[in-house]
């Protein structure tokens, strides 16, 4: 009946489609552990089970073999159940992370740690996998790689890092299948891994091979070559196995291979800037790279390989695939995505037409939305039937009575909680996935063995369609009976003329003769889990219509077995929907934090709490990955509280922004809503269901006492407490539940904050209806309400720590202030925290609070004792009196809102109130800003904005009038004279302002029992007067400062006083120096009542202007100096002017300011000629310019040890080169080598051939990118040349360098290297530069190369003097250009010669002329070639001629026409 499955010749079967290779390898290794070994039939059954199990992949996220085994029916054929049991045992034995190494034996016992304290968070490691085993008795055979094999392996490991468990499993499987040689393994490594990983693997493999060769390997012959060569021989199976094991071990030794590197998966987004992507890579490498691993090569490799395609093209085009990171960043700096702005066009949906649909004939919808199928456009081209499409034509379907199924097309029904409707056939209460069938002529139908599930709540009944061929097909409900040999059908299904035969049937009740008949007509039975009917050649007919049985003859054709799935408890689905966003949508690896031990008392309490949570349905047993520790905490009443330490999960969670601005202000409840009720929810968070995919992040383990056995694993089914997004998620869910209630009762108010709810209504009837609707909605959504804690008027209503009365609000607990001078720091801090909580109802100004806040400052030890001064004790008394009057009014909707702003030296106090009310609505306090100086206009504008924001947010209104304590005169002066940004804000709100002045009794007698100090602030009184124009009769004061000195100049027709002085030792700030210089200048000008002050410091200029308008002084390091300014400026008239420094303008202001700056300048070079030479080794002429005589300079050069050693002649031979006609005309470039301390430097040198100015940079390479970088740096120093001349080295003739020269419009030519005629100048410059470097390193061996090169360039360009022009190279390079000599103008020469000439560029052999030369120069002469133009002609195209005879006289016989080349 069944197919015989021999042992497969293939050593390792292929995995089923959809299952990863490393998972399939675990199943194979578990099968190879069985005794006896598995057969092909076992592998066939395993593959068929896994194929259908992949349609319900809940056991794979993560993989859970126990869950997969529970899905397997009892008595399933083959050894599939045994294979799964091996996997379950192995999974429980392998720890989730390796145990730490045992500590060395200590000399003393470590201190006992508290087992109840949660351990610190430990990073979870990667899960382990099963090792690889060979199949029983099947040796692997060598087979070379093919491209499809390499592609398949690369596809499997594309999502795993080299060295990870998944990577190693796949590679091991490939090694077992193909038995590769050393060359095959090298090809696989180059195909799979990057060059960086391949090089690291190569290093590890070399070290492992060396150790193995030293240790000795069986079969290894040292004389036959290295191990790699011998392993390439397919006959050397033992050596090949040893090499394969070493090759696999090298992966495990890679740095960072213990887990998948997170930085390896960082990819650049399509629109992400390249520098942002590189910054993310750099941060990830800093956090994840093991210590000691070089970061730079990995960063450069990933910066190219993980970049998007556009940036990779840019890097390839510029040759920066593995260049320094700066070059890669510059190459992609200007890259922007092409389609960065996308426009989404949304068209409104048009209403449906009134015409009927042409498909169904009904109006009200478009034809595209019609439920009827689209009719065919015409008759079918195959059968000419107009009722169906060509794809549905019966002629296209082969008329095969029974297609042979595929071996893997097993009809298997695994029980699922929610079957997908598209993948299931329904019938008779059974559920089964569809069978995918293909015709295989070589397959036997007997290999099909479907598993037919039965409904446990009913008998094994199934609905079947029976076609007896004598009547129409009919559907019946039949009993599946494996004990019946034949199928039994009722006689009602057959027609009266159906031929029936008598037969005897032996059943459970005995033998019967007349109850059943036998029909020989074929009967077709269609079962719901089969696509093709069952054909029975004969069956029994029940003449009494009592039985319909599907017997073994029908089931044998199905090749199926019956099984009864285990009864499962139906899940309880809460009415509240699971949140769509939890903060873990990117699904990182769940944390694996070990459970720490608990003492017996705590363990017993934990087990009791877990049992209660399990009964309540909040948790469920769990077997997946992930773990967070748990522990109980005893409360004050003796009960225990369950605590789940979710710190690791919270660190992986993205914060969800809450839409709630905070707790509502209860004073916003109108007095018209007098009827109130509170609702308290029990266990609010435990009503939000948690999606299944997030359970690994909220799993925990309850350990057994003394570790007598494995702990019990649980996971939360609902949102747990301790999760940082739980309050936000619950608040959003509760808001969605209450929103329909708010819309149904617009006249009422529902206040919600977290799980606290307050109902407010104008009448008791409305309150009762609102309460009933709210209660019903909460209960219907599964939120239980605590009836015991419900409060309702008339009665005291306590909500959010406050007591709500009909017309006012008070706090539930007002702190008591003890009056004493000695306080412990925690006591005073706790008292101020409680006062801050009730500050919105405490009638006090900012001053008492600020005084006590200052008492907390300056302490570093929490155990300090604080001693209050008398003013601070007085502040305690003021706060005690204010707290006794703590009360706030409720909002009266018929009255406008009023505001009062009081600016004081300690901060701002803002009050919101309503007229004719006994108490204000709220008191708001704000400290002074942290800036050292804050104009009062800025404070007033900030207070107005804060007041409007608070009233709009809490009351939905703006203050109609705003009172303040600034005088009208001060206010108007600030508006007219200040340029502060707060001026437009004050002008915008000026129509609401009202000045109180000294009117202390109008608004405050009811709020404060004593009059409030609302007089104008003395600090806002202007100290001095600003003059808008300069004062002609007053002197001028200039001051300035640096980090080390300060200076001032007092001038009136001449300098009256000037002084520069150093700063005191602790002060090293330029601002302090500028302020100190101004103070000294004001002190010297104290006798003048008027003064003109000129400052180049913007800080000091704005500070004085703000001080003139009135300001509040904040904290500043210059506070002692700033306190002296009002005394020196009191009652003066000042004109302020800001000067821009270093303008070099000829006006007297700039000159006097420059003179003040000069007082701060310390001479840069205060060296004697000998000291200068010892530092720079400059030449003799440079020393004479620094004050030395010629003899002294010569003696200094002779006495210098470094100069005698490296350059005895004290000069370099001159080179010969065609020089430029002006600066930046022609440059010469070269790369010279300089070796120092075993480091070879490449000096890229550029020389201007006109001035000799040099630019040099030290590099480590001679690539084109380095040459381009050095040229750009030279251009930044010397300017852009017109021509550059280099040798024909690879760096200079590369395409990149030539393209760069073309883009900069620079003409590039080459010369012969080391030729004194063509490259003499740059070679001489190289010698001068290296000679100076040798001198510097002789004197100072530890001098850095960069510093030595900078000193050498300074010496060559700025100090050494050229003998032919007595200028330095820098002076000559920046000297003004000479006027050009025009060639079109006739020039008169004192000495004239006549020449025959040939024009350059022409091949004519005829001499022209003679012509008289207009001008002669070295190498050429200016010859008039026509009547209007002249041209310079070189000597090689000239020959001298005698002066021609005058026309009127005979020729002198002595004169000869001697001609020669010039």
Swiss-Prot record:
The active site is at 481 (for protease activity). Pfam families: Gag_p19, Gag_p24, Gag_p24_C, IN_DBD_C, Integrase_Zn, RNase_H, rve, RVP. A motif (PPXY motif) lies at residues 118-121. Mg(2+) 2 binds at residues 1040, 1074, 1096, 1157. Its EC number is 3.4.23.-, 2.7.7.49, 2.7.7.7, 3.1.26.4. A zinc finger (CCHC-type) spans 355-372, 378-395. Residues 614-804 form the Reverse transcriptase domain. One of its GO terms (molecular function) is RNA-directed DNA polymerase activity. One of its GO terms (cellular component) is viral nucleocapsid. SUPFAM superfamilies: Acid proteases (SSF50630), DNA-binding domain of retroviral integrase (SSF50122), DNA/RNA polymerases (SSF56672), Retroviral matrix proteins (SSF47836), Retrovirus capsid dimerization domain-like (SSF47353), Retrovirus capsid protein, N-terminal core domain (SSF47943), Retrovirus zinc finger-like domains (SSF57756), Ribonuclease H-like (SSF53098). PROSITE patterns: ASP_PROT_RETROV, ASP_PROTEASE, INTEGRASE, INTEGRASE_DBD, RNASE_H_1, RT_POL, ZF_CCHC. Residues 93-143 are annotated as: Disordered. The RT polymerase active site binds 2 magnesium ions. Binds 2 magnesium ions for ribonuclease H (RNase H) activity. It catalyses: Endonucleolytic cleavage to 5'-phosphomonoester; DNA(n) + a 2'-deoxyribonucleoside 5'-triphosphate = DNA(n+1) + diphosphate. Mg(2+) 3 binds at residues 1230, 1287. Gag polyprotein: Late-budding domains (L domains) are short sequence motifs essential for viral particle release. They can occur individually or in close proximity within structural proteins. They interacts with sorting cellular proteins of the multivesicular body (MVB) pathway. Most of these proteins are class E vacuolar protein sorting factors belonging to ESCRT-I, ESCRT-II or ESCRT-III complexes. Matrix protein p19 contains two L domains: a PTAP/PSAP motif which interacts with the UEV domain of TSG101, and a PPXY motif which binds to the WW domains of the ubiquitin ligase NEDD4. PANTHER family: ENDOGENOUS RETROVIRUS GROUP K MEMBER POL PROTEIN, RNA-DIRECTED DNA POLYMERASE-RELATED. This is Gag-Pro-Pol polyprotein. It comes from Human T-cell leukemia virus 1 (isolate Melanesia mel5 subtype C). The lineage of its organism: Viruses, Riboviria, Pararnavirae, Artverviricota, Revtraviricetes.
């Amino acid at each position: 009946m069944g197919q015989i499955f021999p042992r497969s010749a293939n050593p390792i079967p292929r995995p089923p489609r959809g299952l990863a290779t490393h998972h399939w390898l675990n199943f194979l290794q578990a099968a190879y552990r069985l005794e006896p070994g598995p057969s092909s039939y076992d592998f066939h059954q395993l593959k068929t089970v896994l194929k259908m199990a992949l349609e319900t992949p809940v056991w794979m996220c993560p993989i859970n073999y126990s869950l997969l085994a529970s899905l397997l029916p009892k008595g399933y054929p083959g050894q599939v159940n045994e294979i799964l049991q091996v996997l379950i045992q192995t999974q429980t034995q392998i720890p989730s992370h390796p145990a730490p190494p045992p500590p060395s034996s200590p000399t003393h016992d470590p201190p006992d740690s508290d087992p109840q304290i949660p351990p610190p968070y430990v990073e979870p490691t990667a899960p382990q996998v099963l090792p690889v085993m060979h199949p029983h008795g099947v040796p692997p055979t060598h087979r070379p790689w093919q491209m499809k094999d390499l592609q398949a392996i690369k596809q499997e490991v594309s999502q795993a890092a080299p060295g990870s468990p998944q990577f190693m499993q796949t590679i091991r499987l490939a090694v077992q299948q193909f038995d590769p040689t050393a060359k095959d393994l090298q090809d696989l490594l180059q195909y799979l891994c990057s060059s960086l990983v391949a090089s690291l693997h190569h290093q590890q493999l070399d070290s492992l091979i060396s150790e193995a060769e030293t240790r000795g390997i069986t079969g290894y012959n040292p004389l036959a070559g290295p191990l790699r060569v011998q392993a390439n021989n397919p006959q050397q199976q033992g050596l090949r196995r040893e090499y394969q094991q070493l090759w696999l071990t090298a992966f495990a030794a890679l740095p960072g291979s213990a887990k998948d590197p997170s930085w390896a998966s960082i990819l650049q987004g399509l629109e992400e800037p390249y520098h942002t992507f590189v910054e993310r890579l750099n941060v990830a490498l800093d956090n994840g790279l093991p210590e000691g691993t070089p970061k730079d090569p990995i960063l450069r490799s990933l910066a190219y390989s993980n970049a998007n395609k556009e940036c990779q093209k840019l890097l390839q085009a510029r040759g920066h695939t593995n260049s320094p990171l700066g070059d890669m960043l510059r190459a992609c700096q200007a890259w922007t995505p092409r389609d960065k702005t996308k426009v989404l066009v949304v068209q409104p949906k048009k209403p449906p037409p009134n015409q009927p649909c042409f498909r169904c004939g009904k109006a009200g919808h478009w034809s595209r939305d019609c439920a009827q199928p689209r009719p065919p456009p015409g008759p079918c081209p195959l059968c000419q039937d107009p009722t169906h499409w060509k794809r549905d034509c019966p002629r296209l379907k082969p008329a095969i009575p029974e297609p042979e199924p595929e071996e893997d097309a097993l009809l298997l029904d695994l029980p699922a909680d929610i079957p997908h409707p598209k993948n299931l056939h329904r019938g008779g209460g059974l559920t089964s996935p569809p069978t995918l069938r293909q015709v295989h002529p070589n397959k036997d139908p007997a290999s099909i063995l479907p598993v037919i599930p039965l409904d446990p709540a009913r008998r094994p009944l199934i609905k079947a369609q029976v076609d007896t061929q004598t009547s129409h097909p009919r559907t019946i409900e039949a009993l599946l009976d494996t004990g019946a040999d034949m199928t039994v059908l009722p006689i009602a299904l057959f027609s009266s003329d159906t031929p029936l035969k008598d037969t005897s049937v032996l059943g459970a009740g005995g033998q019967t003769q007349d109850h059943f008949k036998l029909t020989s007509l074929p009967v077709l039975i269609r079962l719901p889990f089969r696509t093709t009917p069952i054909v029975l050649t004969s069956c029994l007919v029940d003449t009494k219509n009592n039985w319909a049985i599907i017997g073994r003859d029908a089931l044998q054709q199905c090749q199926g077995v019956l099984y009864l799935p285990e009864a499962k408890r139906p899940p309880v689905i809460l009415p509240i929907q699971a949140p769509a966003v939890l903060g873990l949508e990117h699904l990182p690896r769940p944390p694996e934090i070990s459970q720490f031990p608990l003492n017996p008392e705590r363990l017993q309490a934990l087990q009791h709490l877990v049992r209660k949570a399990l009964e309540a349905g909040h948790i469920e047993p769990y077997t997946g990955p992930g773990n967070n520790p748990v522990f109980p905490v005893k409360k004050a009443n003796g009960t225990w509280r369950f605590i789940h330490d979710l710190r690791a999960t919270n660190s992986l969670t993205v914060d969800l922004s809450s839409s709630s601005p905070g707790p509502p202000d209860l004073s916003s409840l109108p007095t018209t809503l007098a009827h109130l009720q509170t609702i308290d929810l029990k266990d609010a968070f435990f009503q939000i269901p948690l999606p299944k995919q997030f359970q690994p992040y909220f799993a925990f383990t309850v350990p057994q006492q003394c570790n007598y056995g494995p702990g019990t694993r649980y996971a939360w089914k609902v949102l747990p407490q301790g999760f940082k997004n739980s309050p936000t998620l619950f608040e959003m869910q509760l808001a969605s539940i209450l929103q329909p209630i708010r819309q149904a009762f617009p006249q009422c108010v529902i206040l919600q904050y977290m799980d606290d709810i307050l109902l407010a209504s104008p009448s008791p009837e409305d309150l009762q209806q609102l309460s009933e609707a709210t209660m019903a909605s909460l209960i219907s959504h599964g939120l239980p309400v605590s009836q015991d804690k419900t409060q309702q008027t008339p009665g005291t209503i306590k909500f959010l720590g406050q007591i709500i009365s009909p017309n006012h609000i008070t706090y539930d607990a007002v702190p008591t202030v003890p009056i004493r001078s000695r306080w412990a720091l925690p006591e005073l801090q706790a008292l101020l925290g409680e006062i801050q909580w009730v500050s919105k109802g405490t009638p006090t100004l900012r001053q008492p609070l600020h005084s006590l806040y200052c008492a907390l400052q300056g302490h570093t030890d929490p155990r300090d004792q604080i001693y209050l001064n008398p003013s601070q004790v007085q502040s305690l008394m003021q706060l005690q009196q204010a707290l006794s009057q703590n009360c706030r009014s409720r909002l009266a909707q018929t009255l406008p809102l009023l505001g009062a702003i009081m600016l004081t030296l300690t901060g701002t106090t803002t009050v919101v109130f309503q007229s004719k009310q006994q108490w204000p609505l709220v008191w708001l306090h704000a400290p002074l800003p942290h800036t050292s100086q804050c104009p009062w206009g800025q404070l007033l504008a900030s207070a107005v904005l804060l007041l409007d924001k608070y009233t709009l947010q809490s009351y939905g209104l703006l203050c109609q009038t705003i009172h303040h304590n600034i005088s009208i005169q001060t206010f108007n002066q600030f508006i007219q004279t200040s340029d502060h940004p707060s001026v437009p804000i004050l002008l915008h709100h000026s129509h609401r302002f009202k000045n109180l002045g000294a009117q202390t009794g109008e608004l405050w007698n009811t709020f404060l029992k004593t009059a409030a100090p609302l007089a104008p602030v003395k600090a806002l009184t202007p100290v001095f007067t600003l003059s808008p124009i300069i004062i002609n009769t007053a002197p001028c004061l200039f001051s300035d400062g640096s980090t080390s000195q300060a200076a001032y100049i007092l001038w009136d027709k001449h300098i009256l006083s000037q002084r520069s002085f150093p700063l005191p030792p602790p002060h090293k700030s330029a601002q302090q120096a500028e302020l100190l210089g101004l103070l000294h200048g004001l002190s010297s000008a104290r006798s003048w009542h008027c003064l003109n002050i000129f400052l180049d410091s913007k800080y000091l200029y704005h500070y004085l202007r703000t001080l003139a308008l009135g300001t509040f002084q904040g904290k500043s390091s210059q506070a002692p100096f700033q306190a002296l300014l009002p005394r020196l400026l009191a009652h003066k008239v000042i004109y302020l002017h800001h000067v821009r420094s270093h303008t070099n303008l000829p006006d007297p202001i700039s000159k006097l300011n420059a003179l003040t700056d000069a007082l701060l300048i310390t001479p840069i070079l205060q060296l004697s000629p000998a000291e200068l030479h010892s530092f720079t080794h400059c030449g003799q002429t440079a020393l004479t310019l620094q004050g030395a005589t010629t003899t002294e300079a010569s003696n200094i050069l002779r006495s210098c040890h470094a100069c005698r050693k490296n350059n005895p002649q004290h000069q370099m031979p001159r080179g010969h080169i065609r020089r430029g006609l002006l600066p930046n005309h022609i440059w010469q470039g070269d790369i010279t080598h300089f070796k120092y301390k075993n480091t070879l430097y490449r000096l890229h040198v550029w020389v201007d051939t006109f001035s000799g100015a040099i630019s040099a940079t030290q590099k480590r390479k001679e690539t084109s990118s380095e040459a381009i970088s050095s040229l750009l740096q030279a251009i930044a120093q010397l300017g852009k040349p017109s021509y550059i001349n280099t040798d024909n080295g690879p760096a200079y003739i590369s395409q990149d360098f030539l393209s760069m020269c073309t883009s900069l419009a620079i003409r590039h030519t080459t010369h012969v290297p080391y030729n004194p005629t063509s490259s003499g100048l740059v070679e001489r410059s190289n010698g001068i530069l290296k000679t100076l470097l040798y001198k510097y390193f002789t004197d100072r061996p530890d001098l850095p190369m960069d510093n030595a090169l900078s000193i050498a360039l300074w010496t060559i360009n700025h100090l050494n003097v050229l003998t032919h022009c007595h200028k330095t190279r820098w002076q000559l390079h920046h000297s003004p250009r000479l006027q050009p000599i025009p060639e079109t103008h006739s020039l008169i020469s004192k000495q004239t010669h006549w020449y025959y000439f040939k024009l350059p560029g022409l091949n004519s052999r005829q001499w022209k002329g003679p012509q008289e030369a207009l001008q002669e120069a070295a190498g050429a002469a200016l010859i008039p070639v026509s009547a209007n133009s002249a041209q310079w002609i070189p000597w090689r195209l000239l020959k001298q001629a005698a002066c021609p005879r005058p026309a009127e006289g005979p020729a002198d016989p002595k004169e000869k026409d001697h001609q020669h080349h010039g």
